[in-house]
């Protein structure tokens, strides 16, 4: 079931940190302690979810958050998806694909014409998920939703019916 995180309540940060454990472990070296990292993440999330055109979406199964992503409307009807990740213990069960499909339905219901994501060419599971959801690799410059170039990444795009991917 798709859930939108609309406020950072007790337990929200812990649930997301647990889900994003591998990414968080990589980020930890940039902070003086795991607690400092979690505090910074809580501050980021608290600000992020207050914006109408920014969302944290999670796929929940039997009360457990199994997959999550963030999305940002970078231009009217154009949404940037990032931080798609599935909890290690939930991988290989199709939860990321289900989350992507639910996200496509939610955002097209709000008038989205294009969704895009930047994917490392080495991240074959993410590429497979994106392709299975109708995203295609483009030749477009790998610019994220905030207008920052991310060299080495591939921009994958999905468009609603009648809007060709370029």
Where are these regions (language model features)?
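A short beta-loop-alpha structural element at the N-terminal edge
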Residues: 1-18
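Acetyl-CoA-dependent GNAT
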Residues: 7, 18-83, 87-88, 100-101
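Active-site beta-strand termini and strand-to-loop segments that position acidic
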Residues: 60-62, 157-160
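Conserved acetyl-CoA-binding loop-helix of GNAT-fold acetyltransferases
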Residues: 86, 92-105, 128-132
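PDZ/PDZ-like domain micro-motif
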Residues: 89-90, 145
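Conserved GNAT acetyl-CoA-binding A-motif
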Residues: 107-119
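Conserved catalytic-core motifs of GNAT/GCN5-like acyltransferases
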Residues: 118-119, 131, 136-153
């Amino acid at each position: 079931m798709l859930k939108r995180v609309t406020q950072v309540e007790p337990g929200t940060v812990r649930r997301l940190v647990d889900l994003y454990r591998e990414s968080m472990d990589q980020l930890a070296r940039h902070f003086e302690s795991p607690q400092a990292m979690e505090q910074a993440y809580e501050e980021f999330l608290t600000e992020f979810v207050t914006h109408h055109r920014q969302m944290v979406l999670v796929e929940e199964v039997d009360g457990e958050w199994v997959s999550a992503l963030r999305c940002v409307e970078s231009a009217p009807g154009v949404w940037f998806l990032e931080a798609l990740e599935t909890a290690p213990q939930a991988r290989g069960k199709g939860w990321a694909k289900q989350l992507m499909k639910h996200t496509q339905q939610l955002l097209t219901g709000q008038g989205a014409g294009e969704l895009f994501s930047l994917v490392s060419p080495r991240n074959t599971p993410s590429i497979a998920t994106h392709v299975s959801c109708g995203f295609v690799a483009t030749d477009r410059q790998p610019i994220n939703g905030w207008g920052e170039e991310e060299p080495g990444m591939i921009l994958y795009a999905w468009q609603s019916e009648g809007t060709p991917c370029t």
